[in-house]
Amino acid sequence: MKNKQLITIPLVSLSNDQKRWESGREWEEKIFDNKNYIKILALRELPNFSYGIEVKDPSMVTYFGRNTIAIFSNSDFPAQDNIFLVGLKSKPPFIGKLLKNESEIEGEGRKTFMTPTPLHIPESKTSPIADSLHHNLIFKALSQPQGTRFIQQSNICWRHPLVFIHTQEK
């Protein structure tokens, strides 16, 4: 068993009051310019460019628990339970569970938003619907338990995986 390591990471707040959030790449770039940091004891080494999200949304307590910090990373790292912090064009970021990525399983079945037309002939190389319209990611937003979000990949600016959940002692 490894010893716990004391690590200092940026701490960002994620709450229902997201009107103050910048959308797109601007928010992602400001994470590491943040002046608010937290020291945590990690059981394992965290990937580079990790940061903590202080989740204040009561609907997320079911998943994260009370007095926790969700640790995300903007590096290419496997997501814990397929949970991501997702940045969208012209909308505030959200935390969600990736249910399906249609761009990864291209050609493995029927498209979600397929519209039959006379041009859908098996031998045809031309489709009346642009391929980019088929590249959707389906998320279950953790702050909206009833909601599923279908998002075109072209509308996603970034997707940071959840790498660790830190429980704060009070």
PLM regions: where:
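A short pocket-lining beta-strand/turn micro-motif at the edge of beta-sheets
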Residues: 94, 133-135
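Structural motif
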Residues: 68-69, 82
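Low-complexity, intrinsically disordered Gly/Pro/Thr-rich segments
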Residues: 135-152
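Residue-level recognition of conserved beta-strand edge/terminus positions
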Residues: 72-73, 87
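Short acidic/polar capping segments at secondary-structure boundaries
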Residues: 76-77, 91
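Short, positionally conserved secondary-structure boundary motifs
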Residues: 1-66, 77-79, 104-105, 112-132, ...
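SH3/SH3-like beta-barrel fold
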Residues: 86, 107, 139-141
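Short, compositionally biased
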Residues: 58-61, 82-104
